[in-house]
Amino acid sequence: MIRTLRSLLALALVALSVSTAAGADKIRVVTTIPDLKALTEEVGGKLVDVDALARGTQNAHELEIRPSLMLKLRRADILIENGLDLDAWADVAVQGANNPNIVRGAPGRIDVSRGVQVLEVPSTRVDRSMGDVHPLGNPHYSLDPGMAPIVTQNIVDALARVAPDRRAELERNRQSFLSRLDEAMTRWTRAMEPLKGAKVVVYHPQWIYLLTRFGLVQAATLEDRPGIPASPAHLSRVIRQMRDEQIKVLIVEPWNDLKLANRVAQEAGAKAVVLAPLVGGVKGADTYIGAIDHNVNALVTAMK
């Protein structure tokens, strides 16, 4: 498979047009998910040219490796990954790209989860019978805007290794973004304050960082086990719990079964709410702050 993908990659490289002089001066960055693309563009500004391998509407756990993705990696100076096994598929893509700058352990391979306070780290041995449980903990930390200062500092450090003379500019960009994020955080915290302690049901357990940040409680999951479709008996239990505890919101991702989520919510007297798991996951969530804006506004509206 890798040999075939490399052959397709070679053809793509032949067809690739020559980069412009302006583009050649930029640091070529590839990120695994669009949240990291958005944050890298905030920090890097005009110094970077950034591509993301996954789209916001895709389940980042299950990305299909294609020659177009390997082409992006083949030309990258830096690969920025989420880590915590969310983007473990990146190793396969890097192998096909044949770029020594971004192999695991190389200076151009950056895991920005370093320093993040990881939630839901399993306390027992994990096996496949438990579903898609992450042995290193829940990897969806970018849903908590409070993690952005750590992640953006890791990005600054990564870019400064390639362009050490531009560190001061990178730091200024970061501080400018964090100032805007602080203003937004004040707005989000004020809007979510009346909802503290409210219970929600989630389709898939990837929202714990967002819920914890704003004081909401994850009462149940629509999946029986992570990544495994629920049985009718499990769905009945969830509906009964939602009725008994007067839970009004069921959070669902764009790629999951909205028809099922709507049916469960309707039977429970609740609402199914589509949030943005990633930047670009829903219409209007095209920036990092914009994605959190959407999620906060959708929750506040649904819980009125």
Per-segment meaning from a language model:
Residues 23-304:
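Extracytoplasmic metal-acquisition and chelation regions
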Residues 3, 19, 30-31:
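Intrinsically disordered/low-complexity terminal segments and short unstructured peptides
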Residues 11-22:
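Hydrophobic h-region of N-terminal signal peptides that target proteins for export
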Residues 1-9:
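Bacterial N-terminal signal peptides that target proteins for export
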